[in-house]
């Protein structure tokens, strides 16, 4: 293999690797956005749960059923 053909081969590989790195970066950025949205949703669900527990009390505070 001549030095020129080796250089061409290495440049070709680098070009493909650059494309792959960019694609992977795009995926990581999108996953970061998804994670951020999910964190906001979980925080909202926790807030709603805590509000519901505050309204109805915890399980230990429930009055006995009427038939007792």
Swiss-Prot record:
InterPro entries membership: SlyX (IPR007236)
Which residues does UniProt call coiled coil? none
TM stretches of this protein:
none
List the Pfam families.
SlyX
Q: Which NCBIfam families match?
A: PRK00295.1
Q: Which family does it belong to?
A: Belongs to the SlyX family.
- Name of the protein in its database record: Protein SlyX homolog
Provenance organism: Pseudomonas putida (strain W619)
Q: What is the lineage of its organism?
A: Bacteria, Pseudomonadati, Pseudomonadota, Gammaproteobacteria, Pseudomonadales
């Amino acid at each position: 293999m001549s030095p020129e053909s080796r250089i061409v081969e290495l440049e070709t590989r680098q070009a493909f690797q650059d494309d792959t790195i960019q694609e992977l970066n795009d995926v990581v950025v999108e996953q970061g956005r998804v994670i951020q949205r999910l964190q906001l949703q979980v925080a909202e669900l926790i807030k709603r749960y805590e509000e519901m527990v505050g309204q109805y009390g915890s399980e230990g505070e429930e009055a006995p059923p009427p038939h007792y």
